[in-house]
Curated annotation (Swiss-Prot):
The gene is rpoA. This is DNA-directed RNA polymerase subunit alpha. Gene3D superfamilies: 5' to 3' exonuclease, C-terminal subdomain (1.10.150.20), DNA-directed RNA polymerase, insert domain (2.170.120.12), RNA polymerase, RBP11-like subunit (3.30.1360.10). InterPro entries: DNA-dir_RNA_pol_insert (IPR011262), DNA-dir_RNA_pol_RpoA/D/Rpb3 (IPR011263), DNA-dir_RpoA (IPR011773), RBP11-like (IPR036603), RNAP_asu_C (IPR011260), RNApol_insert_sf (IPR036643). It comes from Pseudoalteromonas atlantica (strain T6c / ATCC BAA-1087). GO terms for biological process: DNA-templated transcription. The lineage of its organism: Bacteria, Pseudomonadati, Pseudomonadota, Gammaproteobacteria, Alteromonadales. One of its GO terms (cellular component) is cytoplasm.
Length: 329
């Protein structure tokens, strides 16, 4: 094996085994001895505690004043209903919170798919059972879903919201992490004559709101960004000149024509007065689909072109448009 003894081996992704749509095994090798546990434990902790996601935070059920009561015609008690709501997998697009409505009557199970919502909300597990109705009972509830990170118990919010919270609004312990299970294993690896290397195998499962492969990618990005501070350590006694960063990425200031979309897609955007890429990325999928003559095929094209440039729909740009563009318009 060539190279200096002081140089570290650079690992590579050997295999990504998608066991199911929500579970994957990722193999990374070769790693220097000990680095398997170092990286595996760091990624595991980030995936469990620091990944952003959505969770139910508040619930209102007609006829229910507190969580220790029961609802006539509902097989489960209120506490069990709240526990089932914790298993609701929701994806929000272009917003950080949403209030969902559920109205169901008649005997039978009440499913997550029975929840009414707008186009910016996606119920990922519509077959998830929330409760069971008996007889001709009717159930009506309002469910608040928020984006967050980590685990936030209801008790931490109850003290601060006690005075303003209406009677009957039930607070729920919120686990925002989209990762439901993760483990890692370190095995031996070999490169030429070296047999003391590590192979890291990460086995993880999500609630379906994020692809397992994408979750690992994001956790690695979070870890790298945190470590950047150590890479950029400087002598504090030396003044550091601050570089003036442009307010917006230059690509956002370019006209939409630079994306080289098909004539149909380009004309649809011009008809909506979407002149710059910065204008486009702030639109959501739902908003674009309301554009006359712009169908799902054109929407897919726009998303793919933006993705190739590291952009996406539904982005938020503070202080847009900049003065340079506003003056032109």
């Amino acid at each position: 094996m060539s190279g200096s003894v002081t140089e570290f081996l650079k690992p590579r992704l050997v295999e990504i085994d998608n066991v199911s749509p929500t579970r994957a095994k990722v193999t990374l090798e070769p790693l220097e001895r000990g680095f398997g546990h170092t990286l595996g434990n760091a990624l595991r902790r980030i995936l469990l505690s620091s990944m952003p996601g959505c969770a139910v935070t508040e619930v209102e059920i007609d006829g229910v004043l507190h969580e220790y009561s029961t609802k006539e015609g509902v097989q489960e008690d209120v506490i069990e209903i709240l526990l089932n709501l914790k298993g609701l997998a929701v994806r929000l697009e272009g917003k950080t919170e949403a209030t969902l409505t559920l109205v169901k009557s008649g005997a039978g199970p009440v499913l997550a798919g029975d929840i009414q919502h707008d186009g910016d909300v996606e119920i990922v597990n519509p077959s998830h059972v929330l409760c069971t109705l008996t007889g001709e009972a009717e159930l009506s509830m309002r469910i608040k879903v928020e984006m967050g990170r980590g685990y936030v118990p209801a008790s931490t919010r109850r003290s601060s919201e006690e005075d303003d919270r209406p009677i009957g609004r039930l607070l729920v312990d919120a686990s925002f992490s989209p990762v439901s299970r993760i483990s890692y294993n370190v095995e031996s690896a070999r490169v030429e004559q070296r047999t003391d290397l590590d192979k890291l195998i990460i086995d993880m499962e999500t609630n379906g709101t994020i692809d397992p492969e994408e979750a690992i990618r994001r956790s690695a990005t979070i870890l790298a960004e945190q470590l950047d501070a150590f890479v950029e350590l400087r002598d504090m006694s030396e003044p550091v000149e601050k570089e003036e960063k442009p307010e917006f990425d230059p690509i956002l200031l370019r006209p939409v024509d630079d994306l080289e979309l098909t004539v149909r897609s380009a004309n649809c955007l011009k008809a909506e007065a979407i002149q710059y890429i910065g204008d486009l990325v702030q639109r959501t999928e739902v908003e674009l689909l309301k554009t006359p003559n712009l169908g799902k095929k054109s929407l897919t094209e726009i998303k793919d072109v933006l993705a190739s440039r590291g952009l996406s729909l539904g982005m938020r740009l503070e202080n847009w448009p900049p003065e340079s563009i506003a003056e032109k318009d």
